[in-house]
């Protein structure tokens, strides 16, 4: 009986480990979007005033927060060394407000680094075709605590005025939820 329980426990653990390995391999690759149109240039899209509408869903898919964002965006500098400022004002459905100011730096190779007060270290991103992918760690306030959570953030240009954004939030590799946004350029 003990041997059967031990084997059952080992089998269950092996299946769980295998499932984790498979899900770890099933990620998007920015290169997959290289031929997609319209071609995204962050400097052009995030320039001027934008409105965004979004939801945060928990890991079960339930909407737990709705919000809007007003963004004022600008770029300065010479080609290959541009610096962008994305000034975001969030308003949540419960009436709370939040501000985040991204400072972006574009490299000659087309990659980006970004900083914001609530981002731990730097965000790294790259664009290909109609897509942009960011990876970063965010200090997320929940009640009276702040948690460091990781974001795998993907944006897809749909038209010259509309971009969709889907970001997966995780901690210790465990998915906590997703943020889905629609940006509209004025």
What do the predicted segments below correspond to?
Residues 3-7:
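N-terminal export leaders
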Residues 19-22:
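Bacterial Sec-type N-terminal signal peptides, specifically the leucine/valine-rich hydrophobic h-region
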Residues 31, 75, 92, 153, ...:
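Sequence-level preference for short, compositionally simple segments enriched
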Residues 33-49:
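N-terminal helix-cap/turn-to-beta initiation motif at the start of protein domains
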Residues 53, 58-142:
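Central antiparallel beta-sheet cores of small beta-barrel/beta-sandwich binding domains
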Residues 63-70, 146-151, 175-177:
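Amphipathic hydrophobic-ligand
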Residues 152-186:
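Glycine-rich, aromatic-bearing surface loops/beta-hairpins
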